[in-house]
Structures are given as structure tokens and as C-alpha cells.
Regions:
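Predominantly extracellular beta-rich ligand-binding scaffolds that present long acidic/polar faces
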Residues: 1-240
């Protein structure tokens, strides 16, 4: 399925209430068998996305979450089988002010596998709470049972308000997470220090997650009022 229609979210009137936006808003699977999970296959989005959080201006579960393909993916707490995104592609640029926003799925919360998915879209974010946004061009945050295989980001990510950001994801949040053959080539721009929740691949990882045959290229920089200043990531400084 392919969509060219723009998507607009005008915000939520209630605080502390989840709102999701994407070609698919909320992806759920009981996770007890292959027949009780959701599978998104060959979905492509070209439509631009615009979103405002309204009163739901948090950066956690009870927030407005925007993804080019899906807003949120989750399974039950007893799940052992995963929701699957296969060959999903986002070309749509995002102009949003939500606490979570991503090219593929804003939150890969539990048991979600992404395979051969690519983001080309720009993620331009102006979350009103300075320093609080969690942004990643594939996803913002992971939970248990997450596996990304051959996932690629080629879009830039800009946080105008010092948000935490990563080219693939913002927060690696479980020890069992796996990233295999994943690549990021986009710029990550935010007025934060380069090693403070900001990176070409992920913003933060304090978990024993597995990374195999991944590429972290692109660049990091500061927004600087719109006159962006890039660090110039290279082989000599990319591990700083």
C-alpha cells in the first residue's frame, strides 16, 4: 500500500492521554502466537506530516506520538511473538512539535521487529518543552523484544528546542535489543553537547544491547537559531 495524502494532527484537548498518528495509528498484537500479532508489509508513505501535541505535551506513553508508518507498536506483557514491519518506507517530511516523532514508528514499545525498513524523510521538531523531546528517525524508544534488521535512515533530524535525538533511535531501553545491519546517514541537529543524548546512530544506550555490522555515518550539529553548525563526524572523532 502506498499513500501520498498529507496527515495533520491538531492536538489533544486532554493531558496525560495517548494519541497516535501514522498510516496506522496503534499497532497491537497479543503476542501469544504468529496468528495474534500484527504485520505491516510493503507500506510506503510520501505524505507530509504536521502535528501539534495540544495538551498531551509529554514525552512518554501518555503523549502525542507521530510516525510516518505507525505511531505506536505494542504487545501484551506476556508476549513472546513480535509485531512485524517488513519493507516499510517513509518519504514524508515531518513538521511537528510532539514529544515523540519518527519516520517509521514513534515507539517500538514491546516485541516489535523491523526488517528492510527505510526512512528518507526530514524530521523537523519544535517540541515546546526545551530539552524534553525524544526523537529518532526510525523510532524514539525501544522496549523488550525489539529487533531491527537492515534498517536504514537517510533523513535529517532537527530539534529546534534541545531535544534528545539519534539517527536511528533516541533511547535504547532494553538489554535484549538487537540491531543488525542497520545504517544511518542523516544529520542529527540539536542544541545539546554531541555526547549528551545526541548521536548519529542513537541518542543514549546504557543497556547490553547487540549491534552487529551497523554503520553510523551522517553528522551531528547544533541548531544555532537555524544557522546550523555541524561537528564534522569522521573516523578520528566519531567515538567521542
Amino acid at each position: 500500500c502506498t499513500s501520498y495524502l498529507p496527515m495533520v494532527c491538531e492536538g489533544n484537548n486532554s493531558a496525560n492521554k495517548l494519541m497516535t498518528m501514522g498510516l496506522v495509528g496503534f499497532v497491537y498484537g497479543a503476542g501469544t502466537s504468529e496468528d495474534t500479532v500484527s504485520q505491516l508489509t510493503d507500506l510506503t508513505n510520501y505524505g507530509a506530516l504536521k502535528a501539534d501535541p495540544g495538551a498531551a505535551n509529554a514525552n512518554g506513553f501518555t503523549s502525542t506520538q507521530v510516525g510516518g508508518i505507525a505511531g505506536f507498536s505494542n504487545t501484551s506483557r506476556t508476549s513472546t511473538f513480535a509485531n512485524r514491519f517488513l519493507r516499510c518506507i517513509n518519504h514524508g517530511d515531518m513538521t511537528v512539535s510532539t514529544g515523540r516523532a519518527s519516520g517509521i514508528v514513534a515507539a517500538a514499545n514491546r516485541y516489535t521487529h523491523l526488517t528492510d525498513c527505510t526512512n528518507y524523510g526530514l524530521n523537523d521538531n519544535a517540541f515546546p518543552r526545551s530539552g524534553y523531546a525524544r526523537l529518532g528517525n526510525i523510532t524514539c524508544i525501544t522496549g523488550p523484544g525489539i529487533k531491527f534488521t537492515n534498517v536504514v535512515n537517510r533523513g535529517d533530524l532537527i530539534s529546534r528546542t534541545k531535544g534528545a535525538a539519534g539517527g536511528i533511535l533516541c533511547l535504547v531501553n532494553h538489554n535484549d535489543n538487537e540491531f543488525i545491519g542497520c545504517e544511518s546517514y542523516g544529520r542529527v541537529i540539536s542544541d545539546r553537547p554531541d555526547n549528551d543524548y545526541k548521536g548519529t546512530f542513537f541518542g543514549q544506550c546504557k543497556k547490553a544491547a547487540k549491534f552487529r555490522n551497523c554503520i553510523a555515518q551522517g553528522d551531528v550539529g547544533t541548531y544555532n537559531g537555524g544557522d546550523c553548525i555541524m561537528t564534522g563526524v569522521n573516523a578520528d572523532n566519531y567515538m567521542d
